[in-house]
Amino acid sequence: MEENNIKILGARVHNLQNVDLEIPCGKLVVITGLSGSGKSSLAFDTIYAEGQRRYMETLSTYARQFVGTMERPDVDKITGLSPVVAIEQKTTNKNPRSTVGTVTEISDFLRLLYARASRAYSPVTGEEMVHYTDEQIVELILKEFDGRKIAVTAPIVKGRKGHYRELFESLIKKGYLYARIDGEIREFTPGMKLDRYKIHTIDLVIDRMAVGDSLRERLLTSLCEAMRQGKGTMAVYDYETGKMRYYSRHLMCPTTGVAFEDPAPHTFSFNSPKGACPHCNGLGEEAVFDREKILPDPALSLRDGGVEPLGKYRNNMLFAILEMLGRRYDFTLDDPVGTISEEGMNAILYGDSEPLTINLAEFCLTGGNNLVSWEGVAEYIGRTEDEDSVRSRKWREQFLVYKKCSVCGGTRLRDEALHFRIGGLNIAEVSAMSIARFSEWIADIEKYFSPKERKIAQEIVKEIRERLRFLVEVGLGYLSLARSSRSLSGGESQRIRLATQIGSKLVHVLYILDEPSIGLHQRDNERLIRSLKELRDAGNSVIVVEHDEDMMRAADYIVDVGPLAGRKGGRIVAAGSFDDILHANSITADYLTGRRRIENPEKLRPGNGKSLIIRGARGNNLKNVDVEFPLGKLICVTGVSGSGKSTLVNETLRPILSKLLYRSYDQPLDYDSVEGTEHIDKLVVVDQAPIGRSPRSNPATYSNVFSDIRKLFESTPDAQIRGFKAGRFSFNVKGGRCEECRGAGVQTIEMNFLPDVYVTCKACGGHRYNRETLEVKYKGKNIDDVLNMTVNMAVEFFANIPSIHQKLKAIQDVGLGYLTLGQPCTTLSGGESQRIKLSSELSKRDTGRTLYILDEPTTGLHFEDIRQLLDVLAKLVDRGNTVIVIEHNLDVIKVADHLIDIGPEGGEEGGRIVATGTPAEVARCPESYTGRFLQKLGL
């Protein structure tokens, strides 16, 4: 190997077993292995962490105290490391102002393009707006009004109320004599004023003349004064026709005189006050009160809490007001809210214009007659808006729903910005296009430009085209620039960052990617691989943590970590070319060579004969589809990226069931009706989100088996004698835990300019509990010994305790027997977190009428992990439950009982049901991309 290769000596991060490894530079390297084997520990927690730490070391100690410090990974030595950039799956950007366009910087170039090469059109007449110099305006006036009597005027008031007495007095003092007021030329008189309650338009008369070439200089002088008074706009009044003709130094409508300021990039920015919609401040959505949330049950009365924010009846002023309101609108506090008239309900919700007279003594309240006004429940809720407390804000938000801004229609921009167009399209319309369609449009954009505009736009257009090409190459052509970053999946966010990095044209950089193929249909895989090779060929090193077979075949070098997971992993099983890996003795090699495989099922489950049917689903890009989900089966929803899978399952089906089963406030996207919900009594959504944000969370606490273990220790003779309760055996509360380290087992020593150092607690020796607690034992083991057991060991140890054994067996059954009960959840991979959640569901009793929804459960999973996952899903379905999986992985798709293939393409070209049925039936559909790949598997 070359000298400048990356050499790692003695890596011991997490479960790595003192690993020595040499990775070639300037190559596409794939790190593979089982979930939990140590791939991410090697790639991210060792190589990337050391690269970041070295970068931080270059900063001054002054700077480091502000940006923080990086802990040195547990490794003896790393050499040959170039600057490192990690592109992970995490969707860290929660900013509502962040979009695909802002993240990729395409929006910046697009704003510049519209500021320099767009044309403005009148919002009134639709004709192209013009831009004149003072001399050009003089020529136009001489030509149009030659020989006619005109008045040169300046618009000083446009459609505003007021008497304007002070304005007229000021103008008289300056020597002005006339003005055109509300369409009529009038002479100023002392004390003159207008009706203050009427809307007025006032144009100041600067000069009057009969137009002729001899008065050119006088006309120019008057025009300049009119422009000064009118702030860049003036008008000519034709005495003969009585009409006004407007002119402006700015962009101007030649017919109506409507004028816009010359555009600048910030004119088209929703992050600038100059461009953002003033109503929603550039967010594109507004919070409105949701009547359904305020009145959740029409059968409840006001007394019983029919108006959710007010709660149940209390003897106070609020309900006294409602009772008096009822006398006015003919309802009582005992009437169901659904029977109250629309007029009465509007008065309750939005207030009453007439005050109410309340005799407080009648309601057993102190005082006499009171005149009170009722502002309505909406105003009552809104009062919490100014309160700082998180609790008040959360309480208020539960009654709100976010909808498109009623002013800008979700474009985020001021109205003026939308009247600048290129090829008939404004910037909001272009941003709403799919990236693939936008690429086609901008490929031929020069035809819309004049020669001057073409020259100005040349470099801007080139930059936009390059960035769009990279996004299409990584399979994101279905997204739009206006798509919010918050709505992107981890895989989409990662590929956007990948496209941005390719566009940056950096060289001699080490890129580390975490499974970039996630969320990508098999059809788009080749383009992704091509993009990674392009990054490599630019002179960079690319390390990819990946399980995809196509990616492995395309790699220059493969590192297989294993052989198993957890304590039985963390070693380099094989390293070399794809051919080298095939000859290795590893689980990966077994699957690549076909020695092991996930077999096609011999027969499919018939289901229970019942179905869940959604009719008229039309959210996002769905084309008014009717979809049937046969119950009692493993259902796979497939289709290319952006085809509408998540829209159907996560944004339509899931909220419908959440609302029906749990009175959730989640709003489903548009649909007509749903049938068959009576066959479902429980909904479980299993994702790969972390199962604990704190290091104190572990598999034992998450699965709730730790509560049973603590109760078992409470029942031991030692604990009974000492009077210890179950809480004594918790490391999260005072009593039994070590107070020196507060049950953490380690103590943190803060170092000013270095990373915090963690040392084993001297008081408890890292055992987390105090001496008295550790003296209590069950079968010779104390509570700390139990937390240090692997799940496999604990299953045998607690074999005679059914409540504990059942939960631990469920964790073992999903292939996580290697985890220790006390392992912090923050150290678990996404695949491990997901399987912990599944095990938690497996250990619960079910009625056989549960619907499980999983979104790409194979993320981060090796072939062997997928086999174990499928075994778990099969158990759930065999109990009579229904499992719906959104998936691209062919091993999962081929074993499903029923497929729903959405497409055929992504974005607007998708949203239709291409095929449904068994995998074999879908394989016979020529329009289905999924079907074509299933055919290759022999289906």
Stretches with model-predicted labels:
Residues 1-939:
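Conserved phosphate-binding elements of NTP-dependent enzyme cores
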